[in-house]
Amino acid sequence: MPLASLSLDPAPFPLIRPAAGWSGRVLPVPGPAPRLCRPLRAAPVAPATTDEPSAAARGRLESLSQVAGVLGTQWGDEGKGKLVDILAQRFDVVARCQGGANAGHTIYNSEGKKFALHLVPSGILNENTQCVIGNGVVVHLPGFFKEIDGLESNGISCKGRLLVSDRAHLLFDLHQVVDGLREVELGNSLIGTTKRGIGPCYSNKVTRNGLRISDLRHMDTFGAKLNNLLRDAALRFKDFEYNSKILKEEVEKYKRFAERLEPFITDTVHFMNQSILQKKKILVEGGQATMLDIDFGTYPFVTSSSPSAGGICTGLGIAPRSLGDIIGVVKAYTTRVGSGPFPTELLGKTGDLLRASGMEFGTTTGRPRRCGWLDIVALKYCCQINGFSSLNLTKLDVLTGLKEIKLGTSYYTDDGNTVQSFPADLDLLEQIKVKYEALPGWEEDISSIRDYSDLPETARRYVERIEELVGIPVHYIGVGPGRDALIYK
């Protein structure tokens, strides 16, 4: 939905504090739908067709390396799943390498049906694609089976097509309970997690008392290991409920899970390396994004894994020299869910318009996303870390109707000194000022455009200015949520 089709009441949504109360900022929650206003002026283009890819599309798809990756460049929610779904048609294997059910990827099949995936790789909609959940992923089996049931009820078979690493760690309900208790304990300093138990599960992994998928093959010792986790949680949190009955029920539940999961369990490290030797094409689907990386993100307001290029190797067990093209997915503006610094955040009417037009509510949590201008400083930082070969600019259509669009091109301090790089210091990030470059917007509806040359001149100028500033070419441009709403440049 483009911006020009919206007008907002002075206070269209009730306001609430963000989860962490970061700097006293406020966020809107869903309320009455925005009112429609005058229709858009359509750009003169031929109707889009999805029967055969264009020459530009074929060129881009066929030139990708044997092992390629798709990673987020902001704070998640960039639209990675859609690109993976499209690219997967040209790949033999699609793999997840890190994170868990905190990653929410919304994709659409050829009939326009919407699927919200959290653990299962987005390539599952392509019937000839093998999907892999790698050793770096943490797996919540109840959620995993729920996704599979939802897919199979819609005619999408997962049997024989979905492999789960025997080295991946199990995420239990207890991890989700601990996640919530930890957030309550932190009070006003809470991180604003998805409360999916990701952090506590990775914590057990690092302290070497977690359980892995392979432990499901040894139910004689499974109960004792799970008992250690439950007991530790009860000792740490007084409100954590734990007794022998709970342990027995959990063990019985996981006996059933073990039987159902067995056909999926695979030594995926061996599978991935054999696939490389067999010259199969492999696409890696990153969860979250670089600005949430445990090392490179806005720590501590980050995730617990490495959603950067380095996480591909550690999360799948493949060599760095195997990697080829890495595509960075970047929204045409910036969004963030939860707490943490956000230098280019828009707190007024324009931010509300972006949120409403872009339907900016989290796939995993439903929380309203904070919105702001595209942050070039942060984007360049992500490009340096990951070595992107190209970018996928998404949701360009959402900016339609804005008379002026801004790019945050540099940071400076109160005394006027330029900050040369993206800082680790959160206090500095909170106080930092942003220098903006303003570009003219466009009024035309671009959602049906499939040829780059048919975009309004000002839209092309926006894309090309981003390329100039970050030094990375934009090869893919999203102009709508549908699978076909993509321009190959």
Swiss-Prot record:
Sample GO molecular function, one term: adenylosuccinate synthase activity
UniProt cross-references to PROSITE patterns, sorted A to Z: ADENYLOSUCCIN_SYN_1 (PS01266), ADENYLOSUCCIN_SYN_2 (PS00513)
Residue range of the transit peptide in the UniProt record, numbered on this chain: 1-54
Biological process (GO), any one: 'de novo' AMP biosynthetic process
Major localization class: plastid
GO cellular component: chloroplast; cytoplasm
Cofactor binding: number and manner: Binds 1 Mg(2+) ion per subunit.
UniProt similarity note: Belongs to the adenylosuccinate synthetase family.
Subunit structure: Homodimer.
Name by which UniProt lists this protein: Adenylosuccinate synthetase 2, chloroplastic
UniProt organism field: Sorghum bicolor
